[in-house]
Amino acid sequence: MIALRPTPRAATACALALLLLLQAWSLWRAPDAWFPARITVSLDAGGSVALGRHELAAAQADHNHIALRRDGAGAWWLRNLSAAKQVVLHSAAGERRMGSASLAARQAFQIGAARFEVEDADAASVGFARDGHHWRYDGAVLYRDGQAQAPCADARLGARALALWNRALPAILTIGRPLTFGGNVHCANRLGLADVTPGAAWLARIDGRLQLAAGNPDGERAALTLSAHGLDTDLRRQELPLDGVQAIVVGHTRFQLGAADGQLQLLPSRRVTLFSAPGLQLPPSLTWQWQRRALWSGAAATPLWCALALALAALLAATLRPQPPARSWRADALACAAVLLGGVAALALQRAGHAPAAAQSMALAGAALWLWLALPGRLTLAGAAAVLLLAAGLLAQLELGLGGMETSWLRYYQKSAALLAIGAGLGGAWRLCGPRRTGVPSQRGVEAVLAALAALALLALAMQVLWGDETGVFDLQPVELAKLALTALSAHCLALRLGWHGDDHHRDSRAARWLRLIAPALLFLALLGVALVQVDDYSPLILLLVWGTAMAFAYALAARNRALAAALALLVLLAAGAIAGMHGGADPGEAAPAGDFYADRFQAWLAPALHPHTGQQLLLGARAIGDGGWWGADAKLGLAGLGQGAGAALLIPAVQDDFAPAFFLNRHGLVGALLLWALQAAFIVGLLRTALRGHAAGAAARDHRHAWLGRFRYFTLCGGAAFVLGHLLLSWGTNLAILPIMGQPMSFLSAGGSHLLFFLCPLLAFSAASALSLEENPSCRSTSSTKS
């Protein structure tokens, strides 16, 4: 057995064990919580009942959200009573939103006093007429009398470019944009109507069909009527039969439906309100079947516990056996495989609606973190800091999940644990395979891998532009994969650039070579920027600016270009001074023109108290941070509040993502934040230390392949550290009101699943593999006789 010595690995293991014990203590102290596993509605023929947030245990529903009615024949009917929130019906035919309808020829629809006659309609487009004008909409572009409308005056460059794209390309390649009714201006995809609030109704392609739906404008809501076969239907008061409907979604809570013996059964499956005790006053026609929240056992418990037991057994075999000169490879590989399979199983169960218990997720995350410590190689500063940061982030997410009185809060912790296990398993397998490979990978092979990674990232970004929004596509964030590809591709180009010798080529030849080398990175950067502008999210562009500045500074240091380094440092100081000056001396009323989304956000940052609606996030975050003080809301560094309610901090919008630092400061105070800052600084410094070792090894190598590999490691780790530093700066700046709200998660702390799986885990694996290779080959074979 390994003798316990005060080594960095032992100290990290002790700190990790403490953080895992705090997670277990949180689960142990969590009070019992109850929720309705089954809601039964019993109505006589002709009876009806109104249900809402209280009766459905749906926290996001309105007070009176839906009305259920049973007609004389015993059939059940549903009507949406909410003026602002939709109800979605799921059946074998697909998804249908209440308050919407598919248009057909010879129908008519009326918005307020404006009546439109539908001339023709199919899956591709719909044509309608009013007051002698003929309109056609194809899901992307609105045409008036055969001509596309001009862009709106307030349209940004991205919206104008998107409009040109949709007009020029075939329908299959267009990017869907809804048609909105209301307002007094005809432009782009807006159809102006006098005395109708903008956004009173909209027409868009949903599930391959063009559907008309009532909107939720800020002003007065106009009536929306559909006339078909001599009948007029008010879409805002639409009533639909539940025959054939399998599930409904009310206020983000999903209910499986089942009708039998004059009763309607509703089985809530997500975002269900929790109660401290089983017992609630309900209408006579409503009964609940109570169920206790299970934190220690869940769906498919036995197979998942078996996988975790296998992983833990392999980890024990890898760490507690006598230490031989060459470590055993099989036990480590078995541990990686078991952790990977456990993560895949946990993620699949969660996606299927049967999430594992919190204790299973805790054990899975613990196995993944111990795997990083058990794998061969010296534990670096970056690796130790990353393990502790991941454990601290999981503890904060578990506190968030246990502190919220809603079943959905735990899903962030469960998803992060599953993705961490997947990333640790894949990264560990790569680390194990690295020492078994001999030699340096060929440049062509590396370029092929980088090209494939860039193509995959571009494809994912295109999917986000076509089918997603600023939050991602298919519950993933392609931007995270794009950042990884951009970092690796740029590192390769810069590594090749440093390999040139000043007396090898003429000036023109060197300029041409530079252009050819950097062109792929510039092209990818341009495409990434265009894609981000199209999905209406500018904060990643600011993150790219931070990354680009850091990469240029790293190149200046490597090339010993002191003038460039000094210019970049001066630029950073000027930017910091400009931000401080704007925040301290700008007039909130004149800082930016009103009416633009980012202008409103900028004004809310300068004076959130003057904008109580748009500045609510900043105000709630500041209040939570103030309540935390130095030692946390419980005055005991958050230890007394483990497993207990989270209070008003849960009211902060996006508290699990953008404002996770505000929640952490509320729970653990400024002292806890200082410890977190120290770990974050240690991680950045650790990455840079490994990067400098790689650069030194490349500079000492006499073989051009080893020299390129050292420089590639240097720029890749510098780029990764720059992105992480950018995330930390933007997140802390947002939460502390130093910067406007940027919408970027904090690395390791926020519940950013894609950021963890697609960026952090590959970066950690590359850093560990680089450190291991540099440890085994400290000179990078500098005695080789091959000339560069």
Task: Give the ranges of each region predicted by the language model.
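Hydrophobic transmembrane alpha-helices and their immediate junctions
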Residues: 244, 251, 306-317, 670-726
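A structural signal for hydrophobic alpha-helical transmembrane segments in multi-pass membrane proteins
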Residues: 2-38, 241-468, 524-527, 675, ...
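Membrane-interface segments at transmembrane-helix junctions in multi-pass inner-membrane proteins
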Residues: 407-409, 465-490, 508-517, 538-540, ...
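Membrane-interfacial entry segments at the cytosolic side of transmembrane helices
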Residues: 327-330, 377-384, 440-446, 511-519, ...
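Hydrophobic alpha-helical segments of polytopic membrane proteins
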Residues: 520-534, 538-590
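A juxtamembrane structural motif centered on a specific transmembrane helix
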Residues: 2-4, 708-716, 726-788
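Forkhead-associated
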Residues: 44-115, 119-122, 136-137, 141-235, ...
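Hydrophobic, glycine- and aromatic-enriched re-entrant/interface helices and adjoining loop segments
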Residues: 38-40, 564-676, 709-712
